[in-house]
Regions:
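Conserved MFS/SLC helix-loop-helix module at the cytosolic interface between two early adjacent transmembrane helices
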Residues: 55-92
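Structural signature of the two symmetry-related core transmembrane helices
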Residues: 72-86, 276-291
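Hydrophobic core of transmembrane alpha-helices in multi-pass small-molecule transporters
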Residues: 14, 84, 94-114, 118, ...
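Multi-pass alpha-helical transporter architecture, strongest
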Residues: 88-90, 173-184, 379-411, 418-420
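Juxtamembrane intracellular "pre-TM" segments in multi-pass secondary transporters
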Residues: 1-3, 183-219, 412-416
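A membrane-interface helix-boundary motif in multi-pass transporters
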Residues: 150-171, 360-385
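Helix-loop boundary and gating motifs at the non-cytosolic
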Residues: 2-50, 213-251, 319
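Helix-to-loop junctions at the C-terminal end of transmembrane segments
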Residues: 55-69, 152-153, 260-274, 362-363
Length: 420
């Protein structure tokens, strides 16, 4: 891969996640403060990510893999997405906002796979060449948060400026849309082949569920996405109400933590194994929400920061470890199908259920238009994570020890990730 191609791919990855990070982190605050929505409506808006994740395999399987070059589809989707994001910024109420953002996420979620496809097709050694390019995506997400706080769009009492996050994302999406047509040619790989629904959804890997331990892990993965949905939808509104300054850039510490813990996964994997790694990840979810429940912007401010920084443990130790576990258990034939299957289950089904539950609970503990009983709200997902952890420890038997060095497989997982 030449330096010019590496630069283009890095810019593509930066913009891909800059766009998402520009509006998604502050979505809950924008909806609650600007559009005066309910918690249920915020949850519904967050479920658009899940719906997009469910639809994405069909767009990739029916269009990208069979008929058109990946970089051209990427460009078209981002140009359309840019127009939709600007349209979303003009919505005066939730009924006008929701259908626009739903269509946008159905178009955006497939681009996460497309940027990986464009990248991998240019590489001779993906395990070494991809991670430095993928990390630019996380940096793009962080930079978006820094800009939002630097421009004071998320300052206390100034939430009306958050509409600008959609405009910033719109402009970046149009730039990436145009830029995509300059990317290296990535022709369809399955032109003329028949692709079944099972192929697109990864259902060929459903046989893994015959393994009792994997079935327990699979159910736990869906269940742990319920607490995850609370963070995605309501962390930013909580920090705002708690009195935290520069909430968006502060939340980006979670992505910094994620990068650091990603590097340390091989070290811990060798010493802890699959079961303990997954358990630590679930324990971290419970702990972070307890910290949020008892933290504040005063003497317990450290609890809020600690809860944010735990994101690296929460995500990497459970979800990335789970991807490695799935990859090794599936075998060479079903690797891709297995990853698609677990992604559909977690970010599709699990997050969808979790977002709806989170929205209902936030509404149930609303005190006024500007205040909620956050302590109770956060203790609920903490309890859910704790119950999932206990059941997992009792039922999961780590009979399938990793036979390969997890450090060799770690880089391969990064293309499957939807989170940053």
């Amino acid at each position: 891969m030449t330096a010019a191609i590496r630069t283009k791919l890095s810019a593509m990855m930066f913009l891909e996640f800059f766009i998402w990070g520009s509006w998604f982190v502050t979505l809950g605050t924008y909806l609650l403060k600007d559009l005066k929505t309910s918690g249920i409506e915020v949850g519904a808006a967050v479920t658009t990510q899940s719906i997009g994740a469910i639809v994405a395999p069909f767009i990739i399987g029916l269009i990208a893999d069979k008929f058109f070059s990946a970089q051209k589809i990427l460009g078209a989707l981002h140009l359309l997405g840019g127009a939709l994001l600007w349209w979303a910024s003009t919505a005066a109420n939730f009924s006008a906002f929701y259908p626009v953002i739903l269509v946008y996420m159905i178009l955006y979620m497939p681009t996460l796979a497309l940027v990986n496809s464009v990248s991998f097709r240019q590489m001779q050694n993906p395990s070494k060449e991809f991670p430095p390019i993928r990390v630019l995506g996380t940096i793009g997400w962080i930079v978006a948060g820094v800009l939002i706080s630097y421009l004071n769009w998320d300052k206390q009492g100034g939430e009306a400026a958050l509409v600008n996050t959609f405009k910033m994302a719109s402009i970046a999406s149009i730039i990436l849309g145009l830029f995509s047509f300059t990317l290296p040619a990535t022709p369809p790989v399955k032109r003329g082949e028949n692709v079944s629904v099972g192929d697109m959804l990864g259902l060929d890997a459903i046989g893994l569920l015959k393994n009792k331990s994997y079935l327990i892990f699979f159910i736990a993965s869906i269940a742990i996405c319920v607490p995850l949905a609370f963070y995605y939808g309501f962390a930013n509104p909580f920090f705002q109400e708690a009195g935290m300054h520069a909430t968006t850039v502060t939340q980006s510490l979670g992505q910094v933590s994620e990068i650091l813990f990603m590097v340390m996964i091989p070290f811990f994997f060798v010493r802890l194994g699959v079961k303990k790694m997954l358990a630590v990840g679930m324990l971290a979810w419970a702990l972070r929400y307890v910290l949020f429940a008892y933290g504040d912007a005063g003497s317990n401010y450290w609890m809020l920061i600690a809860g944010i920084v735990l994101h690296g443990v929460c995500y990497d130790f459970f979800f990335v470890t789970g991807q490695i576990y799935t990859d090794n258990l599936a075998g060479e034939r079903f690797k891709s199908a297995a990853q698609g299957f677990i992604t559909l289950a977690t970010y599709g089904v699990g997050m969808l259920i979790g977002s709806l539950i989170a929205g209902q609970i936030v509404d149930n503990y609303k005190i006024s238009d500007t205040a909620h009983n956050w302590q109770t709200i956060w203790l609920i997902p903490a309890g859910i994570a704790a119950v999932v952890l206990v059941l997992f420890l009792l039922l999961f038997k780590d009979k399938n020890h990793m036979e390969t060095n997890p450090a060799l497989n770690l880089d391969e997982q990064q293309d499957m990730r939807l989170d940053v």
